[in-house]
Design a protein with these regions (language model features):
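Signal peptide-directed extracytoplasmic domains
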Residues: 36-73, 93, 98
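Helix-boundary and loop/linker segments of multi-pass membrane transporters
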Residues: 12-13, 74
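Post-signal peptide N-terminal segment of mature Sec-exported envelope proteins
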Residues: 14-44
């Protein structure tokens, strides 16, 4: 009886994390990449560029993400959120010099961040297993696919000039 109880306590793989061995390796890689590359680059970026410039760059990319949030809000039937995102984009793109200045926040127009992973969840797509993505960190299979779609539909990805596209991608990551 004791022998059977001991065997009964042996655990198999966690059903919510069937990719655990791979996830652990990717997490170790991400930790190393963060320590060796990403953090030093971010520190230099912070030391070289004044706060106002960094804020403007962040606002610019935030304005671009508001465009996709608008479409995802519509797809999730969140019409009020879609309207607010449309107002944010209109105000920040025109009055905010292409989004560099975030007037919409100053005007108390709430940001409603929605992505394609959330849209798939809204329409009943299950999350799938937990996965750790290189450089991006923890996610689910559904949200990983959503991240791929978000990236492919990103405004910057539509640029033909590879150097400009790569520069904007690098700036967004910092």
């Amino acid at each position: 009886s004791l022998l059977l109880q001991g065997c009964a306590s042996l655990k198999g793989p966690d059903p919510t994390d069937p990719l655990e061995p791979l996830n652990r390796k990717v997490t170790a890689f991400n930790d190393m990449a963060d320590d060796v590359v990403l953090r030093p680059v971010a520190v230099i970026y912070g030391q070289v560029l004044p706060t106002v410039v960094r804020k403007g760059i962040g606002n610019f990319f935030s304005n671009q993400s508001d465009v996709m949030s608008f479409f995802n809000s519509l797809a999730q039937l969140k019409l009020q959120a879609a309207a607010k995102n449309a107002m944010r984009v209109g105000i920040n793109t025109t009055l905010g010099l292409g989004g560099i200045i975030d007037w919409a926040t100053e005007l108390k127009i709430d940001k409603h961040k929605e992505d394609f992973g959330q849209t798939m969840a809204f329409w009943g797509v299950s999350s799938g297993p937990y996965v750790v993505l290189p450089f991006f960190g923890p996610s689910t299979v559904r949200d990983s696919f959503g991240l791929y779609i978000d990236n492919k539909t990103d405004v910057n990805q539509q640029l033909k000039d590879t150097a400009a596209k790569n520069t904007l991608t690098l700036l967004r990551l910092t």
